[in-house]
Structures are given as C-alpha cells and as structure tokens.
C-alpha cells in the first residue's frame, strides 16, 4: 500500500528548491490525486512562513476532504523553511498571522527528497525531475527536520 493510495495531495513547491510541477510529475504514476499545486518563493515570504493564500487553501481542503485524507508535499530548498511549512500544516501557523493560526490539522507532510516520497514514485521520473536538486540540497537536514515535526505534531503516523 502506497502512502498516496486514496489520498488528496497538496503540493507547495519552492522556486529555489523543488518546484510544484516537478513534484506533480513524479506523482503521475501513483494513486495520488493532486488537488492543488503551487510554487512559492519561501525566502520571499515573511520569515519563511507559509503564504496566507496557501494556508487558506490547505484549511479549505482539510474541511472539504478531511485531514485524514490529505498529504502535503513540500519542496523547500532549506530545512528551516521545510520545517516551517510542515509545522504550519500540522501544529498551526507559528507566526499566528494566517488562517491556520491555532489550527492543529496534524496533516501528513513530507519533503520531496524524503525516502517516503522517493520510494513511492517511479525512480526514473524522480531522477529526471528532482535528482539534480537532490544533489545540491542538504537532504539529511531536511529529512531530520521533517521527521521531527511529524513526530511532534503529526496525527496520522501510518
């Protein structure tokens, strides 16, 4: 059983990391249904926080489909930015500025370089779409940060 079986996927890519279309392309061979994909500039938003529009969309999809049916994928270039995005969709907006302030959705959230994502998609497509960025990103730091956030705030640890 894949992480994506029967799941609705929200993609928040990064202009300086892994863009949304690259992540979406990797998902084409899975049972995932991409309901939203965006590519942001994480360093452009306030202190690397998740864009307010994206927070609103995540909240709306959680209301529409149920938090248990969602997976959020991020492509942030840095562990800190990835962690902020992950914290926002699990524990709520840490800046207390957006629609997810105080909203603990506990969503499943992964970075595109994590093994949970990488192992669930076609390796040739992954190498073509993400392989080059994987070589320049600090993958170990990103994995550690994402795992820490999931362990602290994730409600769906399957």
Curated annotation (Swiss-Prot):
The keyword Oxidoreductase applies. InterPro entries: GRDA. It catalyses: acetyl phosphate + [thioredoxin]-disulfide + NH4(+) + H2O = [thioredoxin]-dithiol + glycine + phosphate + H(+); acetyl phosphate + methylamine + [thioredoxin]-disulfide + H2O = sarcosine + [thioredoxin]-dithiol + phosphate + H(+); acetyl phosphate + trimethylamine + [thioredoxin]-disulfide + H2O = glycine betaine + [thioredoxin]-dithiol + phosphate + H(+). It comes from the Bacteria. GO terms for cellular component: glycine reductase complex. Its EC number is 1.21.4.2, 1.21.4.3, 1.21.4.4. It is an enzyme of class 1 (oxidoreductase). The active site is at residue 44. Keywords: Oxidoreductase, Selenocysteine. GO terms for molecular function: betaine reductase activity; glycine reductase activity; sarcosine reductase activity. Coiled coil: none annotated. In the first step of glycine, betaine and sarcosine reductases, the substrate is bound to component PB via a Schiff base intermediate. Then the PB-activated substrate is nucleophilically attacked by the selenol anion of component PA to transform it to a carboxymethylated selenoether and the respective amine. By action of component PC, acetyl phosphate is formed, leaving component PA in its oxidized state. Finally component PA becomes reduced by the thioredoxin system to start a new catalytic cycle of reductive deamination. Belongs to the GrdA family. Monomer. Component of the glycine, sarcosine and betaine reductase complexes, together with components B and C. This is Glycine/sarcosine/betaine reductase complex component A1. It comes from Peptoclostridium acidaminophilum. The gene is grdA1.
């Amino acid at each position: 059983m894949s992480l994506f079986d029967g799941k609705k996927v929200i993609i928040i890519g990064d202009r300086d990391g892994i863009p949304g279309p690259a992540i979406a392309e990797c998902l084409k061979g899975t049972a995932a249904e991409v309901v939203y994909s965006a590519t942001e500039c994480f360093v452009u938003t306030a202190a690397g926080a998740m864009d307010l529009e994206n927070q609103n969309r995540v909240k709306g999809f959680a209301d529409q489909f149920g938090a248990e049916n969602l997976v959020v994928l991020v492509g942030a270039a840095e562990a800190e930015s990835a962690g902020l995005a992950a914290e926002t969709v699990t524990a709520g907006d840490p800046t207390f500025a957006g629609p997810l302030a105080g909203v603990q959705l506990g969503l499943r959230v992964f970075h595109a370089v994590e093994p949970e994502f990488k192992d669930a998609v076609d390796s040739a497509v992954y190498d073509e779409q993400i392989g080059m960025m994987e070589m320049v990103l600090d993958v170990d730091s990103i994995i550690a940060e994402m795992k820490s956030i999931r362990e602290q705030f994730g409600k769906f640890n399957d």
